[in-house]
Curated annotation (Swiss-Prot):
Transmembrane segments: 30-50, 233-253, 278-298, 308-328, 337-357, 365-385, 405-425, 855-875, 1022-1042, 1075-1095, 1106-1126, 1135-1155, 1174-1194, 1218-1238
GO biological process, one term: lipid transport
Keywords: ATP-binding, Membrane, Nucleotide-binding, Repeat, Transmembrane, Transmembrane helix, Transport
Pfam families: ABC2_membrane_3, ABC_tran
Domain ABC transmembrane type-2 positions: 182-383
Gene name of this polypeptide: abcA4
Gene Ontology molecular function, alphabetical: ABC-type transporter activity; ATP binding; ATP hydrolysis activity; ATPase-coupled transmembrane transporter activity; lipid transporter activity
Name of the protein described by the UniProt record: ABC transporter A family member 4
Any one GO CC term of the record: intracellular membrane-bounded organelle
Length: 1615
């Protein structure tokens, strides 16, 4: 627990810092929950403020309404009889009394008589009549038989309620007030009373029951029932889980980039990791939770469930969501779709919870379903809504309801269950890296007791010695140094360790039964060719990959069962950088210091500062890691490995890869300083590095241990004397006769000598020990004939480690093949000319193969959209149709008995004798009424809201001095027909009290006359259409976003850039992607088309409109997504963001359009429709998703696309199908054109370049080197004479006054990367760029390749101006980036085939060319495996091969030998010597030996400026000061070796800090008294041989000159 506590604080600080670095993401995490819950409350608030009308409204007014251009239809079978006509006359009388100004003719025209009901129906439905008809009255044949007067009121069926229904909770009786029903009813009733001599003017009004939802919480009832009950759980889940979207993406990215496993290898406790992420996430998550609970409770949306109960539900639910996020992360290895998929899964579960909450299943089953917490929250949402609604009987009683406390219990149980699941999955699912435990691990004793394996003795070591285990086919006991038994026990013991990988060619053995021991205070180096198993061994020791067999002990713990204990003591610097680009150097070091044992914050800060200074990052402490150069990142990773008091086992893989000579020596000193009390395993390809640093060296080839021992042991075992290295002048490289002459001279003096290698300018000879007496004579002759033999210099040393390595590897199968015929096939197969169709073929093959290999992503990108679309189709065909108007014409007698035996409260205002008598004789006579005092009526109705259909209030009112009997009908909203029934009841009772007769009123609706909107809605399920359109937009948004993610990935990994530089036409790149992505998208289109045509005849009928729309839509959304991808560098983030934009914009535009269009139709407003058209034009122009949704709506006849002035007939008219299709076509053109304009921007700018647009390059320094100044003169003459171009191009590369300044961004200051460089490089020359990290080498190559735009200056390639004729200038260039731009899902063979087609190699030659490169680079064994699994060195081989394909005239090689072994490096030198015969090559390197071996001319750069320029010898002559003597002392002379050496060479001086046993001296060579090499060798052999293990003598080396010239560089601030 102590370790968890110690790690928790730094993890929290790291996570919080990372969260705080991205202000936008943090803001979104806070805003997204608010937006989600805000949308819910916006909808709910609208439902609350759109309240019912509670005002008193007139139910009378017949005479007033009919007089305003309205007609009343009246009739009876055979015509009106006398009684019926009396009623008609009294109706006319009412009009004439109300409007005495109207003539009788006018009044008569207001009434239309009919003799049969069919004629009345026909008249009503005539389009020319129905707008002027207020309704009709029909008298049945028995209308005046007996004591009942019968008549029927006829209005449009949509102006009444469904006569077959008596109750409903969404409508009320106000519809009868608004559409003249009650006006006709009261008018006819008044006429009947007059006919029966009852001359009481009656005025009726209607009013909804007083709102029973008095309290604020009650006002939410409608929204609570319609919205919160059905969608609340999903909204709450969405609002809370949105906070975790970033967490999921970041965790999966940490897995993907090996950062997570890197932390684990250095002791990270998984529990601490999850706890720290939980705490940081819970800060925002719980804030959102508290906010949601406060909103729900404070708004009183949730009322009967207390706030504390809400908190007790939402907090554990938030925790379960967090745990679900962690669990889902275990199943994602790529960040592409992780966040989005997790979000959809959780929302889906929450949606299922809505169904379960409402479903009448047993409480036990409901609680069991709550094991999925998103289901639980939806069930809880149902419970708290239910509690608030049951008060008003708004929901039916559910006997299977669970209570909120049971749900709280389940959520708490879920927390513990999910923790258990996470613990289990964390052990058995490790992803790509890490060792998974067996599924039954928790049942084993080893897991709980941490037992050692049986072959380990009590001292924590293996019983079997390592040497007895190494018994492979190539085993030779003499090659293994015996370990002194007095040494302490080994800290690392490896026994029979083996690892096999499955590849395209079957199983490949990476490590073959390795057995070895390592000890404290010692550095153990692994040497071997690329892919020999070195990094794989380290990965097994750190637990990143599982051994196939064998075991290893580290500090007594075995790696199979106790890896967690081992990791507490590890410091690891892997081959790839495991850093967060947002964190600073100091933040990295402080974090890992805390992770590895420093508990005091001040101590961490001091240690971090100290170690940063020692690795040369002192002034970068506060710089984000993303701004560091490649070499600086390696320094940071090395510092991370060493920091911490518990790091006593250090594993470092290529620590100085990419570092210049000066910084490399700095790192050597650092490693030696920190070696004490540590066991260090070093993997490196710098043999000098291993020689200087290592106590023990193991050489591995083909996964087998070939030898093991100290450097001296290996040299004595494999060396047979001295190594003579002769550097020839560059003009004699291909002179085989010269090589023979030099060899003859040497063999004449040393008959037993042998030629070891002839690579580039370098000749290496083996001179046996017994011939040492002949050395002086040999050196004397070489000195005398130095010019004649074209020898620049020579040196001699005792057997070097490099020689040992080359000798051992030369006997293995890993040696690259310099077969001349193979070389010619590979390097001299020229491009036959770039062909568009060939490039297109290559790119399409690439997409097919990457999709096939990443089948999970491919299936998900297709399957998920298909599933979403399938859901839309299911809803479209199966969702219940909702009628938007009432079609029921069945008659309904408006009788009080419709609502049973309910008692009606009656109130009388101003009680007097007349009113009392009227009440007693009429309504009061009924046993269905009860008298309630007026001042108590309001409260009575509120408290008796349920179960009372209506109430009555009576008083007398005056209008124009006429006294009226007024009664107000209070109607309950749930009783659909209450208002006309109560009017009938009152009027009938008044008639009965006087005549004994009753009135029977019947509602007999006309068949509904459909409006244009309703005509458009015939047989249309508009709710189903809305869901179908939404889910269709979602599916296409997702697939379009997934395609954009691929583009972002290729751009961020620079694959796209390399393709362009290799000659790919940009239009072909986009065409290939469009073709493949269109094909993939059309899988979705075909699925949609087949299904929708099969199930819906509308799509069959209008197939032309649908198919044109979906095809144009597909053609438009892909390029739009490509365009949007330019703003993203991460695949996962691109997919998530682009999906949200596509779907969100399309959905919002569609909803707005539908609302506006429906409003225009309902209001029959041409002007509003015009405004809607303008808005839609804008939507069309912005979003193709809106265009397609409109087409779907048109085909499905959605009412929201109808028009006021146009019949919905012509599907291809302008405003219907034509316009969106035309706009979609324009979208295709616009987005593709926009992409090409962006991509071709450099070419376009070049065509219209104005020289003034370029900044003037800075004026060269006054003290500029004379050779650099002379080069400016030469280049100016070349440019003035236009010496370039044509097939005979002499200078393929010319750049003049080249200048690049990076402007300041944010906190980063502006920087001049290249000051003012001028060079001309002819064909046949290899030009070397040397310089410190960050001096401008890679920037120079970037400008030459066109990747970086220069700030000023001019570049000419192959005779063409790069700015003005970009395409021609870049026609024949090969580029090898500093960081491999390889497609991880393709093998070496597949990538080479791709670039052969890109560069125009003839199809018939591709196979042979690719085979030649694979054979030449020794890649046969892995040629069919994906390059993502290659070692760094093998990746460099592939990258160099790509650059060389097609025999380009210009090669730009950036650190080509970085990370490759010595054998391959020498092979590359030979390749370069062969290549340069007809090419101009620029090589950047940190290997001085490489520069000397292959470069005809070189420059040393410092702070963007050229400091020296010329051949190797010229620079040595100009800046050197004599001879350089490098020595390695015997151990016993470590203290006084320098002093003894200076005694023998008094004029010498120590020119570099001593590194362990190695030292470098400078010996002046004055021109007036020159010293011969032979005399130096003689002096060493006679006076110093006894104190030296090794030495070499040469002219002052380029490396020493390099260190001298770059000593005060601002890019080398720490030196």
């Amino acid at each position: 627990m102590e370790s968890i506590k110690n790690q928790l604080i730094p993890l929290l600080k790291k996570n919080w810092t990372l969260k705080g670095k991205s202000k936008i993401k943090l803001l979104l995490e806070i805003l997204l929950p608010l937006i989600s819950i805000g949308i819910l409350f916006g909808i709910l608030y609208l439902s609350m403020i759109i309240t019912r009308d509670f005002k008193e409204r007139p139910a009378s007014g017949f005479a007033f309404d009919i007089a305003h251009t309205k007609q009343l239809l009246i009739g009876s079978n055979g015509g009106l009889n006398s009684d019926q006509r009396n009623i008609l006359d009294n109706l006319k009388l009412q009009v004439s009394i109300q409007h005495p100004e109207f003539s009788n003719d006018y009044i008569n025209r207001c009434f239309v008589e009919f003799k049969d009901i069919e004629s009345m129906d026909e008249y009503f439905h005539d389009p020319f009549n129905y707008r002027g008809v207020m309704g009709g009255v029909w008298f049945p044949d028995d209308s005046f038989n007996g004591n009942t007067i019968k008549y029927s009121i006829r209005v449009d069926s949509d102006f009444t309620h469904d006569n077959t229904q008596q109750f409903q909770d969404r409508e009320d009786s106000q519809i009868y007030l608004r559409h003249y029903f009650t006006q006709i009813q009261t008018g006819v009733d008044q006429a009947i009373l007059l006919t029966n001599q009852i001359a009481i003017p009656i005025f009726a009004t209607g009013q909804r029951f007083p709102n029973p939802y008095i309290s604020f919480w009650e006002k939410w009832t409608d929204g609570r029932k319609l919205i919160l009950l059905n969608t609340g759980g999903v909204f709450i889940t969405a609002s809370l889980f949105a906070t975790l979207f970033t967490l999921i993406t970041n965790i999966v990215i940490e897995k993907e980039t090996k950062i997570l496993e890197g932390m684990k290898t250095m002791g990270l406790n998984s529990f601490a990791y999850y706890i720290s992420n939980s705490i940081i996430s819970l800060i925002t998550l719980l804030s959102s939770t508290l906010l949601v609970s406060i909103i729900l409770s404070a708004s009183q949306l949730v009322h009967h469930v207390k706030w504390i109960t809400l908190i007790l539900i939402l907090i554990p639910y938030s925790i379960t969501l967090l745990l679900i996020a962690f669990i889902l992360c275990k199943f994602f290895t790529k960040s592409k779709y992780a966040g989005l998929m997790a979000f959809l899964i959780v929302l889906l579960l929450s949606g299922i919870g809505i169904i379960i909450g409402r479903f009448n299943i047993s409480p036990t089953l409901k609680l069991l379903s709550c094991l999925f917490s998103p289901i639980a929250i939806s069930v809880a949402n149902y419970v708290w809504c239910y509690k608030d609604l049951i008060v008003f009987k708004e929901v039916d009683i559910n006997v299977n309801m669970v209570n909120e406390y049971e749900i709280i219990g389940m959520l708490v149980f879920d927390i513990f269950l999910y923790i258990l699941i996470l613990w289990y999955l964390d052990n058995v699912i490790t992803g790509e890296y890490g060792i998974p435990k067996k599924w039954y691990f928790f049942l084993t004793k080893n897991y709980w007791r941490k037992n050692k394996k049986s072959n380990i003795n009590n001292n924590g070591v293996f019983d079997v010695e390592a040497t007895s285990c190494n018994r492979n086919s190539s085993y030779n006991e003499k090659n293994f140094e015996k370990i002194e038994h007095q040494l302490e026990r080994p800290t690392i013991s490896i026994r029979n360790l083996r690892k096999e990988f499955k590849t395209g060619d079957g199983n490949r053995i990476a490590v073959n039964d390795l057995s070895i021991d390592m000890y404290k205070n010692r550095i153990h180096s692994f040497l071997g060719p690329n892919g020999s198993g070195k990094s794989t061994t380290l990965s097994m020791l750190t637990g990143m990959i599982e051994p196939t067999s064998g075991d290893a002990l580290i500090n007594g713990f075995d790696i199979r069962n106790n890896i967690d204990e081992i990791r507490k003591h590890l410091g690891v610097c892997p081959q790839s950088d495991i850093i967060w680009e947002q964190l600073t150097v100091m933040e990295h070091l402080e974090f890992y210091a805390a992770l590895k044992g420093f508990t005091n914050s001040n101590q961490r800060k001091v240690e971090a500062t100290k170690i940063a200074l020692e690795v040369g990052l002192g002034e970068k402490l506060n710089a984000p890691a993303g701004t560091l150069s490649g070499g600086q990142k390696r320094k940071l990773c090395l510092a991370i490995a060493f920091i911490g008091p518990n790091s006593d086992i250090i594993l470092i893989d290529e620590p100085t890869s990419g570092l210049d000579a000066s910084n490399r020596r700095l790192i050597w000193d650092f490693i030696l300083k920190y070696r004490e009390n540590k066991t260090i395993i070093l993997v490196s390809h710098y043999l000098e590095e291993c020689d200087i640093l290592s106590n023990t060296i193991s050489i591995i080839a083909n996964g087998e241990l070939k030898c093991n021992g100290s450097s001296l042991f290996l040299k004595n075992r494999f060396g047979v004397g001295y190594l003579l290295t002769i550097s020839k002048e560059h003009n004699s490289i291909n002179n085989s006769n010269l090589t023979k002459t030099i060899s003859d001279i040497i063999f004449n003096h040393i008959p037993k000598g042998s030629l070891l290698s002839d690579a580039g300018t370098e000749l290496c000879f083996r001179l046996p020990n017994e011939s040492i007496g002949n050395f002086s004579n040999l050196f004397k002759e070489l000195d005398d004939r130095k010019k004649q033999l074209s020898i620049e210099n020579y040196g001699i040393s005792i057997t070097t480690l490099e020689e040992v390595f080359l000798k051992i590897i030369s006997n293995s199968e890993t040696n690259p093949n310099f077969n001349q015929s193979v070389l010619n096939t590979a390097l001299k197969t020229n491009s036959s000319g770039i062909k568009s169709y060939q490039q297109l073929k290559g790119l399409l093959i690439k997409r097919v193969k990457t999709s096939r290999k990443d089948i999970k992503s491919f299936v998900l990108s297709i399957l998920i959209p298909i599933l979403i679309l399938a859901g839309g189709l299911i809803l479209y065909k199966n969702m219940r149709t909702i009628d938007i108007y009432n079609t029921v014409t069945q008659p309904l007698i408006l009788d009080f008995n419709v609502y049973g035996k309910s008692v009606t409260p009656v109130s009388i205002d101003k009680v007097n004798e007349t009113m009392t008598s009227l009440f007693d004789n009429s309504i009061g006579h009924s046993d269905r009424t009860t008298l309630v005092p007026y001042d108590e009526l309001h409260d009575y109705l509120i408290h008796h809201y349920f179960g009372v259909p209506g109430a009555l209030y009576f008083d007398f009112r005056y209008f124009k001095n006429v006294k009226f009997l007024h009664y107000n009908v209070f109607f309950n909203k749930d009783y659909l027909h209450a208002l006309p029934i109560y009017i009938n009841f009152v009027d009938s009772e008044i008639l009965r009290s006087v005549t004994g007769k009753r009135i029977q009123t019947t509602s007999l609706p006309f068949e509904h006359i459909q409006s244009p909107l309703e005509v458009a809605s015939l047989d249309v399920n508009f709710v189903a259409i809305v869901f179908f359109i939404i889910l269709t937009l979602a599916s296409f948004s997702l697939i379009a976003a997934s395609h954009a993610g691929n583009i972002s990935h290729e751009r961020s990994t620079r694959v796209k850039r390399l393709l362009y530089i290799s000659g790919l036409r940009k239009s072909i790149y986009w065409l290939s992607n469009l073709i493949w992505d269109y094909l993939q998208t059309f899988i979705l289109v075909i699925f949609l088309t087949i299904v929708i045509i099969a199930v819906d005849d509308k799509f069959r009928t209008h197939f032309d409109l649908y198919i044109s729309g979906v095809v144009l839509f597909t053609f438009s959304i892909i390029p739009l997504s490509y365009l949007m991808s330019f703003k993203f560098s991460s695949h996962g983030k691109a997919v998530g963001a682009i999906f949200a934009i596509h779907f969100g914009v399309g959905l919002i535009f569609t909803v707005i359009s539908f609302i506006l269009r429906v409003w225009a139709i309902k209001e029959n407003s041409i002007s509003f429709q015009f405004l809607t058209d303008i808005i839609e034009y804008c939507f069309y122009a912005i979003s193709p998703f809106f265009c397609f949704s409109k087409i779907l709506a048109i085909v499905t006849k959605f009412p929201g696309v109808s028009r006021v002035d146009q019949s919905f007939i012509d599907y291809w008219s302008f405003h219907f199908g034509l316009l969106p299709n035309a706009i979609l076509f324009l979208h295709c053109i616009v987005w593709i054109t926009w992409i090409l304009l962006i991509d071709y921007s450099s070419e376009i700018k070049g065509k219209f370049t104005i020289s003034k647009l370029f900044s003037n390059s800075p004026i060269p320094d006054s003290n500029e080197d004379s050779d650099v100044s002379n080069e400016r003169i030469i280049v100016k003459q070349l440019l003035d004479n236009n010496t370039n171009g044509g097939s005979g191009n002499v200078y393929p590369i010319i750049f003049n006054n080249l200048y690049k300044k990076f402007n300041s961004v944010g906190n980063y200051k502006s920087k001049i990367a290249v000051y003012n460089s001028t060079l001309a490089i002819p064909t046949g020359q290899t030009f070397g760029l040397l310089g410190l990290n960050g001096c401008g080498k890679s920037t120079t190559l970037g400008m030459i390749s066109g990747e970086i735009s220069p700030t000023g200056g001019k570049i000419k390639l192959n005779g063409y101006d790069l700015i003005k004729n970009r395409n021609d200038a870049l026609t024949s260039i090969g580029y090898c980036f500093q960081f491999d731009a390889l497609i991880g899902l393709l093998s070496a063979r597949e990538q080479l085939e791709l670039y052969c087609r890109i560069k125009g190699v003839d199809e018939s030659k591709i196979k042979d060319t690719v085979n030649a490169f694979i054979q030449m680079m020794d890649l046969e064994s892995i040629s069919n495996s994906n390059t993502s699994g290659y070692s760094g060195g093998n990746k460099r081989k592939v990258s160099l091969s790509i650059a060389c394909i097609g025999s380009p005239s210009i090669l730009l090689l950036d650190e080509i030998s970085c990370g490759v072994d010595a054998c391959v490096k020498r092979f590359m030198w030979n390749v370069l010597m062969e290549l340069k015969k007809n090419k101009a090559i620029i090589l950047t390197t940190h290997s001085i030996a490489e520069c000397q071996a292959v470069c005809d001319k070189l420059t040393i750069m410092k702070d963007g400026k050229l400091q020296a320029l010329g051949s190797n010898q010229h620079i040595k002559d100009k800046f050197g000061s004599g001879y350089s003597i490098e020595v390695k002392f015997k151990k016993e002379y470590l203290e006084n070796g320098v002093e003894l050496f200076l005694q023998s060479f008094p004029s010498a001086s120590l020119i570099d800090n001593q590194h362990a046993l190695s030292a470098s001296f400078e010996l002046p060579n004055p021109p007036n008294n020159p010293i011969k090499l032979s005399s130096i060798f003689s002096n060493i052999e006679q006076s110093l041989k006894f104190i030296l293990d090794d030495y070499s003598v040469s002219q002052t080396s380029i490396e020493q000159i390099f260190i001298k010239l770059t000593k005060n560089s601002i890019t080398n601030i720490d030196n």
